[in-house]
Amino acid sequence: MEGFMDSGTQTDAVVVLSLAQAAVLGLVSENELFGATISAEAFYPDLGPELSGAAMGEPEPPGPDVYQLACNGRALEEPAEEEVLEVEAACEKHTRRKTRPPVRLVPKVKFEKVEEEEQEVYEVSVPGDDKDAGPAEAPAEAASGGCDALVQSSAVKMIDLSAFSRKPRTLRHLPRTPRPELNVAPYDPHFPAPARDGFPEPSMALPGPEALPTECGFEPPHLAPLSDPEAPSMESPEPVKPEQGFVWQEASEFEADTAGSTVERHKKAQLDRLDINVQIDDSYLVEAGDRQKRWQCRMCEKSYTSKYNLVTHILGHNGIKPHSCPHCSKLFKQPSHLQTHLLTHQGTRPHKCQVCHKAFTQTSHLKRHMLLHSEVKPYSCHFCGRGFAYPSELKAHEVKHESGRCHVCVECGLDFSTLTQLKRHLASHQGPTLYQCLECDKSFHYRSQLQNHMLKHQNVRPFVCTECGMEFSQIHHLKQHSLTHKGVKEFKCEVCGREFTLQANMKRHMLIHTSVRPYQCHICFKTFVQKQTLKTHMIVHSPVKPFKCKVCGKSFNRMYNLLGHMHLHAGSKPFKCPYCSSKFNLKGNLSRHMKVKHGVMDIGLDSQDPMMELTGTDPSELDGQQEMEDFEENAYSYASVDSSAEASVLTEQAMKEMAYYNVL
């Protein structure tokens, strides 16, 4: 202890403090000059200046006033006797050292600008700071603040500043533009980046085992790395002034903010990876008429109403489509295109064609579809010049040309699978008199029709009815005739209830109930519903009577009159009135009788309803129509296999006339 009091050999115990730390302790002001020396007087204010450099008498253990701090007057607990002895031993150790120069105070500078060679650390023995301290000093040691991080070696003794430490809080960096000279790296807690230029990566310690992610925190080079097991741990970060860009924030608020900032950094990283800087200025604006301007692309001259659409369009030229479908992973340039595409997965088709009611997901598809209903065909074949509404149709058509399977009409451009179909189609462009019969000068559109017609002149009838022995030149004529033997009349008029064997006869009959009579005779000005009825009527004005009876030689101008006459030779009157005993050889005569005598009209041979009245129908028109139908349906129902030769000749003649009137 005597050596400790010797002023000749004893130097003052000094500690390295920065200006900020000295200002916090109340030792110096912030305007203090560099190189100031802090002596033991600052820590022991009760010792006068006369005792600082002279030998002291008996050494006495320091009392409570010795540990009184000048900044706020808070006193520490009195150290134990063992601690006093350790302090004395430490002071004796300093007596054997050489005189050291005054220690410079380190000014408060930014961590990234502090050099290693500018820092000097000295070992200082301070009362109450021993590793064997009692339990009373343990909490204060554990709560040591930012001053602990300024010492590199575990052997360096630190001053207990727990009385001046604040409550542990979390640092949050203020959003601002980073400085260009700072190389800020994104935070990754699992994969820390390697050290650069011998300096550890910037980091800040949380009050727990995990590190706080920060973008602008830098660790000065004189601090020990966090992985050093001997380095003192920082349980509470040192308060930093607001001018450094930090604000205080509680841990719960920080977690909520970092969750959103992480998403923003992820989006920003995606945009950064594009590595494309699109600069759009007013030079992209072009006049669009009506004092409107549009943003026009300089690569394809396509224009848009908004600058954003132009930017996404330019990115599309570079193959960048940032919007992906979650269902099929298809990429799109704009979010509106993605929303339209999602309608296909939802089954929604809002755009409908007004002509055929076909629905589409996009208006562009509907517009392209409308070309099918118009004469506009923008896609033309370079082989034959035929136009198409869709490019897919054009491609499929050109494939037929290349494979030789396409037979195209030179008049209208239609294609056919076979050459026969093409030749038949060409006949429609060459007029109605291409194929003409040499026997009767009748013309036909197709060759097959002329060939069937020539069978009538050659008297070739290969199709024979098994019921009555009637022969027909075509199979469909036999099928129609066979229905008359079955008595099946499946087609019924909805107006008058009359039944028909053939649907064509029923449709022709339905025209009688309409008020439209477009066909008129130029001789008597009588009007008719059907063209065929007018042709039949014209025979009345002709002096020629082509229908002649083979039995008596009587001639008739209409076929049904000849058929009725033949019933007289046979002695048969098959049509009987249901109201009286009158019989008739023709159904038309029976109908006329029922209309005049009884005021009703019969329904048919098998179903005669006397309650059905004929209203709004011309009797002559009805009789003529019924006579035509009677000829087609019932003319041959009374011929038998063992008929005479005359009847057979008559039947053949009737068949010829039927074919004559059926062909327009």
From Swiss-Prot:
May be involved in transcriptional regulation. Keywords: DNA-binding, Isopeptide bond, Metal-binding, Nucleus, Repeat, Transcription, Transcription regulation, Ubl conjugation, Zinc, Zinc-finger. Residues 121-141 are annotated as: Disordered. GO terms for cellular component: nucleus. Transmembrane segments: none annotated. Belongs to the krueppel C2H2-type zinc-finger protein family. It comes from the Eukaryota. Gene3D superfamilies: Classic Zinc Finger (3.30.160.60). The keyword Ubl conjugation applies. This is Zinc finger protein 710. It is found in: Nucleus. GO terms for biological process: regulation of transcription by RNA polymerase II. GO terms for molecular function: DNA-binding transcription factor activity; RNA polymerase II cis-regulatory region sequence-specific DNA binding; zinc ion binding. InterPro entries: Znf_C2H2_sf, Znf_C2H2_type, ZnFinger_BTB_dom_contain. SMART domains: ZnF_C2H2. There is a cross-link at K110, K113, K377 (Glycyl lysine isopeptide (Lys-Gly) (interchain with G-Cter in SUMO2)). A zinc finger (C2H2-type) spans 295-317, 323-345, 351-373, 379-401, 407-429, 435-457, 463-485, 491-513, 519-541, 547-569, 575-598. It comes from Homo sapiens (Human). The keyword RNA-binding does not apply.
